[in-house]
Amino acid sequence: RSQTVTGVQTCALPIFWSEAGPRSFWMKDTTIPLSIAFMDRRGRILNIERMAPLRQDRFHRSQGLARYALEMNQGWFARHGVEPGDRARFRLPGGPATHPAPEKGHSR
């Protein structure tokens, strides 16, 4: 299944999957440079990939099993000091902050 961001100049796209798994993205038909952070089921950033626009020949893959991803304008993560190993919290519209589930056998 292909997912793309087209026709926009800025980007902040959260992506959620029901299960953690290996993930990959490409930049076909996407005209702005993006960065993507792949996160595990606990919200820990596995890796951040810089993605060049309109590239159909390069896939950007998670370095581990990803449950979440966040696409931002390229360089956003670096400018804000976000790096692999950091953890994210999410706030869904109209709801409280969501903390990704801890690993089995671990408490918060």
Where are these regions (language model features)?
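Short, P/G- and charge-enriched loop/turn segments at secondary-structure junctions
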Residues: 1, 23-24, 56-58
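Single conserved hydrophobic/aromatic residue that forms the stacking wall/gate
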Residues: 1-11
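Mature exported/compartmentalized surface modules and terminal targeting/interaction regions
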Residues: 4, 107-108
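Short connector loops at helix/strand junctions that flank enzyme active sites
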Residues: 8-10, 29-33, 40, 63-67
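Core catalytic alpha/beta fold that binds nucleotide/phospho-ligands
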Residues: 9, 21-23, 30, 84, ...
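Mid-length scaffold segments of soluble, non-membrane domains
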Residues: 15-48
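Well-ordered alpha/beta subsegment
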Residues: 53-106
